[in-house]
Amino acid sequence: MTLSEMLQSVPELSEKDAEVLLRAGSQMQYMADLSNTDIFLDCPIGDGKALVVAHAQPVSGTTAYERDVTGEIATAEKEPAVFNAIAEGVPICDIKAETQEGRPVRQNVCPVLSEDGRVIGVLIREKDISEELIREEKYEQLAKHFAQIDPQLRAEENSGRIELREVHHRVKNNLDRKSVV
């Protein structure tokens, strides 16, 4: 389905609202390619849901999606930034969310306003953070492991210092004895 056809399926939108959303949607592929991320245009349809009316994937680079999710429903539980931007009418940045396919992403969301200032849609930039979360988990595991062995290392380090001081003390005593003789 085209963006125009998708917008016709949202009864809350006037013709002028659809024109505003069509203008926003016409730039989505450029945004996807420029940011190397998935870009969406969602329209609120009530009951804590939004309809994905357009999806642009970067031509080169990676996408967080196996398929085009145009026509699918976004929910407040999985995409809180989308619904905060709809409710507040302000951009929401850097919020974790979950895709329709269950992948973790980080979202930036910008409301699209009608000519009279109502939120009629949102532009969404999503970046897959699966690898980032795996790295964070590995880092936490390493930190826990280090925290466990750190006291042992410090004890060994301290005993090594004591032994070194003892050696220095003995060398000094031997030098003192030789200087007396």
Q: Each predicted region: which residue ranges?
A:
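N-terminal-proximal low-complexity accessory segments that begin disordered
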Residues: 17, 23-26, 32
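Sensory coupling linkers of modular signal transduction proteins
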Residues: 113-159
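Short regulatory/linker helices and ligand/cofactor-binding micro-motifs at input modules
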Residues: 7-19, 150-154
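Signal-transmission linkers at sensory-effector interfaces
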Residues: 1-12, 138-145
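Short alpha-helical H-box segment flanking the phosphoacceptor histidine in two-component systems
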Residues: 159-170, 174
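Structured interaction and signal-relay segments at domain junctions
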Residues: 28-92, 100
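Conserved small/polar residues in nucleotide/adenosyl-binding loops
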Residues: 180
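A short beta-strand signature within small-molecule sensing/ligand-binding domains used
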Residues: 92, 102-111
